From Swiss-Prot:
UniProt superkingdom: Bacteria
Lineage per the UniProt record: Bacteria, Bacillati, Actinomycetota, Actinomycetes, Frankiales
The organism of origin for this protein: Frankia casuarinae (strain DSM 45818 / CECT 9043 / HFP020203 / CcI3)
Biased composition (Basic and acidic residues): 9-20
InterPro entries with a match to the protein in the record: RNaseH-like_sf (IPR012337), YqgF (IPR005227), YqgF/RNaseH-like_dom (IPR006641), YqgF/RNaseH-like_dom_sf (IPR037027)
MF annotations from Gene Ontology: nuclease activity
Pfam families the record matches: RuvX (PF03652)
Gene3D superfamilies named in the record: YqgF/RNase H-like domain
GO cellular component, one term: cytosol
Protein name: Putative pre-16S rRNA nuclease
Annotated localization: Cytoplasm
Stretch list, region Disordered: 1-27, 170-202
EC number: 3.1.-.-
Length: 202
């Protein structure tokens, strides 16, 4: 797996910014171990909205089949996948699983590029926003993955337009170091009061 950005004709997912500069619909994806949240932008790349929640299918990849269909039906120009790095910035098992998922997706939708963005605390932010809207806990479970995908995509859209700093979604973004790499503080970002940070089991 290369850490560089996706290039035209290169189906490998990439981490670099900025992404594809063409106008058009972009798809945001929040990959969990149980469910996959999907969001989409308007063609102007201003607003992200929820699309659906897919059940993971590790054997038959039915969820990837549905994602491919969504990308094609909406004529998406790019797919943005949240990368659940640990609060320290290190990559654990969850990140490896997401990278593998994204590689399969990238091969299926090439030449549409697939790009990673840091999604730390995204699910926390999704839970918080739904709580603020009065969504009950039981209903929240079925919606949180879509909301997390919205958070991932909206932050990327805002960063692209220069109205949000690239970095951690759902909390204040740390400044980039001299080498241009964004790193979390030593103790990691602090979750909002009363909110339990998400686990990898989503």
């Amino acid at each position: 797996m290369s850490g560089s950005g996706s290039r035209p004709g290169d189906s490998r997912p990439g981490d670099s910014r900025p992404g594809d500069s063409r106008p058009g619909v972009r798809i945001g994806v929040d990959v969990g171990s149980v469910r996959v949240g999907v969001a989409a932008s308007d063609p102007g790349g201003v607003l992200a909205v929820p699309v659906t929640t897919l059940a993971r299918d590790r054997r038959g990849n039915a969820d990837i089949d549905q994602l491919v269909l969504i990308v094609r039906e909406r004529q998406a120009v790019e797919v943005v996948v949240g990368l659940p790095r640990q609060m320290s910035g290190q990559e654990g098992r969850a990140v490896r699983l997401v990278r593998q998922y994204a590689e399969v997706l990238a091969e299926r939708i090439a030449p549409v590029p697939v790009r990673f963005v840091d999604e730390r605390l995204t699910t926390v932010a999704a839970h918080r926003r739904m709580a603020e809207r009065g969504v009950r806990s039981r209903a929240r479970r079925s919606l949180v993955d879509q909301e997390a995908a919205v958070q991932i995509l909206q932050h990327d859209l805002d960063s692209r337009r220069g109205s949000a700093a690239p970095g951690v979604i759902g909390c204040a973004a740390p400044a980039a170091g001299p080498d241009g790499v964004v790193r979390a503080p030593r103790d990691g970002p602090r979750a909002p009061d009363g909110v339990v940070p998400p686990s990898d089991e989503r």
